[in-house]
Amino acid sequence: MTRPDPIRSALFQISRPIFVTMRSGGPLFSHALPAHVSTQGEPSGPIPFDAFAPAVPLSLLGDRTFTARHHLKYPYVAGAMANGISSTQMVQTMAENGMIGFFGAGGLSLPEIEHAVVTLTSRLNDAPFGFNLIHSPADPDLETGTVQLYLKYGIRRISAAAFMRMTPALVYYRVKGIHQENDGRVTAPNQVIAKVSR
């Protein structure tokens, strides 16, 4: 019988197809079509494998609208963990590899956030990345100051966390710069992605 490790290994190689054939000793896994199966025309008899899963490249997982909207290669988001745990290096690595990372600005002072903003904007230019905006009900000035900082440096994506309702700062970020294109479409350049925690 096939041990679990080869099964797991075969299943985790999602960029390759997998063929499963049942044998008396258990299932056999292969990433190649059995050699005696023709790839031309219709099969003349029963297909000599019991199950098949096609290759699924990482770039095809998830919502294609999301990847197009944010100019991503892969539909993956990482970060927005508070106190800079989601570091500038992590955000940069995600952006340089076709994914999106959010810097974890929650719990940091405005000068610390500004340092991270300057670092990432100088390194990444138009690459996809963003910053966290955490709701601060006990300190609305911090929330407003963070938004003003993001707008000052042209941060176009934020991950909004811990919001129980819309706040003036969050709404201001979203609508700042809203305009109508020549073709009549309304464009809001600042994007808000809601971070939902349980």
Predicted ranges, named:
Residues 1-198:
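Active-site entrance/lid segments in N-terminal catalytic domains of soluble metabolic enzymes
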